[in-house]
Amino acid sequence: MEAPIRNPFTVLIDSAESQPWTFDGLRADADKGDAPLHVPYEFANLGRFPDSLGDYSIAGLVGHVAVERKSLEDVWSTILGWTTDYQVERGINGRRERFKRELQNLAAIPAGIVVVEAPLERCILRMPGADGLNYNEDSHEGSNEQRGKHTVRENRKIFFRSVVSWQERYRVNWFFCGSRRAAEVFAFRYLEKAWEHYLERLTPRERKQFRGAIA
């Protein structure tokens, strides 16, 4: 059995995450023998609306790097303003406006992105609507009333134009990945690069102090 290599930083996962990534099955770079990579993670409060700072960060770098995770159902309901059973139970309203505030928060930090667990094509082509097209994969449930009053065609326009507009307005990049696993790997590699680039900007003394502070 190959001995795993411990990742040099700890991933912080927001304690409100309902389906968290745990970064299992990753491997180190070739210069480290392509060994299995053990990624330590901890659950933490990364902020609550209106001060939320994404779903994932790095210990010691909260407020510097953040990844906002969106499942397919979540990105639909957020952009189109639908109310899911989960949100009704928790009294969460106005998801679209709340998310715009979250994007403002991401834009204010050096490295903040949105990662979606589905490709853009799937988000568009499988769009439900009030005129009869229902999405019934995975755990998606809910009435057409919860999904809004717009037709599929209208929903597609609203969704696509919102994604384009919000990226231009808030300067926060969105990455639509081919699957949940692809999104998980992408998010980790983004955090990894943000960690490396942060350390590169420190002097040797500052780097030593920083590593000691988060050990």
Model-based region annotation:
Residues 65-71:
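Conserved catalytic cores of phosphodiester-cleaving nucleases, focusing on short active-site segments
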Residues 1-63, 76-215:
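Non-catalytic C-terminal interaction segments of nucleic acid-processing enzymes
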